[in-house]
């Protein structure tokens, strides 16, 4: 495993897939820009599945209009029960609630987002884990080009600095924020190692 843990800049590697339990759950993890949402959204119009994009649980501004009809219900349930949607290691509480919600509704579950790999140990996940292993430079560029034009943030920068400086400021800020992808990449490789070592 360590031999393969080097950074792949452009080359994609096959997704890492591991079944942890017989639950009808697919957990899709990977760095920003790795294709998690694209993979999960293939099931969004399939009535057998609930597709939860974790970023949308936190009201992160997006220009995307695609959202599972159950997502607002899940969010409402979490806020009603806990007062908020937990982040970090505490997300495991929300994770269990989301699983129970899917089971009560007799649906298979696809859950995707970076907050999933805050659950420790990663082997606590249920069902199948799919780790997207897209080349790191490709992830970085995808994330920058996807997130740069998000109208909410772009509008704030333009209002603050004017049309030209505002756009440059937005680009600078998004590049700075998306540098975290390189740290995430190594963390995900460690998660794969942990999954590999799990009997």
Regions found by a protein language model. Name each.
Residues 1-17:
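N-terminal pre-Walker A segment at the start of P-loop NTPase domains
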Residues 28:
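Hydrophobic anchor at the beta1->P-loop junction of P-loop NTPases
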Residues 32:
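The conserved Walker
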Residues 37:
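Walker A/P-loop
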Residues 50, 56-114:
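Conserved nucleotide-sensing/catalytic segment adjacent to the nucleotide-binding pocket
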Residues 112, 124-146:
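Conserved phosphate-donor/acceptor-positioning beta-strand/loop module used by diverse small-molecule
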Residues 149-199:
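Small-molecule kinase domains that catalyze NTP-dependent phosphoryl transfer to phosphate-bearing small molecules
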